[in-house]
Amino acid sequence: TGLLPKAKNIANRRIKNANYYDKNFSKLPQITIPPRPKNFKLVYHLYIIFAENRDQLLKYCLKKGIEAKVHYPKPMYMQESVKFLKHKSGDFPTTDEHTKKIITFPCDQHLSLKEMSYVVKCVNNFYKNKI
C-alpha cells in the first residue's frame, strides 16, 4: 500500500501534535505562536514558533537531543533569488524580527506523546532557568 491512503491519518496526527505544542507553549510568555488562519486546515511538516533567546534555546535543545532547527535563517527578501529587487537589510523590520526568533521543532506523525512532553519540558526548563 502506498502513502496516499494514509495521508488523512498522517495529517490528522500532525495537527494533533501541533495542537499539543500550541496548548503547552502558549503558557510561556517568551514564546509567540504564529496566528493560525481560521477556516484553513494547516498540516504541519514543521512546527514553527517565535522564541526569545532563540539561539540559546536552540543550543540547549540540541544538547538535550531535541531536533530543533532554524529552517529560515535569512529573511526571504534577502535571499539570492530576489537579489534583483535590490532590497536592503532593514526594509522589512517585522520580517527581520521574526527571522531572529524563528525556531522549529519536530511535529511529524511518528512522535509519541512522551517525546513531545520531553520537548515541552525542556523548553519550559530552559526559560525557567533563564529568569
Question: What does each model-identified segment do?
Answer:
Residues 1-131:
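PLP-dependent aminotransferase class I/II
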